[in-house]
Amino acid sequence: MDLGLLAICFALFVVATLYASVGHGGASGYLAILSLSAYGAMEAAWLKQHAWCLNLVVAAIAFWHFYRAGHHVPKLTIPFIVASVPLAMFAGSLKVEGSVYDLLLSICLVLAAWRLYTVGTEEGDIRGVPQWNVAVPTGGAIGFASGVVGIGGGVLLSPILLLKRWATPKSAAATAAIFVWVNSLASLSGAALSNQLVLEFETLLPFFFAVIIGGFIGSRFGADVAPQHIIRKLLIIVLIVAAMKRVVGLF
């Protein structure tokens, strides 16, 4: 393994560790790292599809740890994925290029991080799961955006769950993890059904190794060790880092 590939794998490991700690797959970070490496010359479809594959691995590991620790609430998760799956699949079949999407996503991430910061770190009372007429369109919109941009949607869903007090940080992480997994799979399926799949499994193998280790470390810390307020702070960091990486990609 040459030094360049080793550096990429280490960076992917770090991203997977941080994102898995809050139940995310890490696609935003993976896209940024790959774009800043020699793989940046690849088409957007190649980058998105490989990021989705890494998402599948890390989100699965994260969900398992948060589920095992008793943080998953099915009645919170199901309404959000009902519409997100078909819309992510449809969006994944679209061929989307242009920097406008990077800019819009960066704005969304910064706003989400700012809102999380301004509400403070106190937990407050959980209001309970949202009504289906609210959760279904919310999940659908995030699913569509995920398929267009190349993410799993965790960085968009988690802030909403916390700001609306529909979930604790750890239950939000569990829901975000399964949400990311189904959206990533749906988006890849959409690309496959539209004959746009360009996966290189020999390229993915070392990446898988790196993110599996990071995913285990991060999700174990987030599910079993970190206090709730630490999870909130980690999520703010994740959102800011993802936004900064997107902005860098515009230049």
Q: PLM ranges: what are they?
A:
Residues 1-21, 25, 29-45, 61-145, ...:
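Juxtamembrane transmembrane-helix boundary motif
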Residues 186-190:
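Alpha-helical transmembrane segments of helical membrane proteins, especially in multi-pass transport
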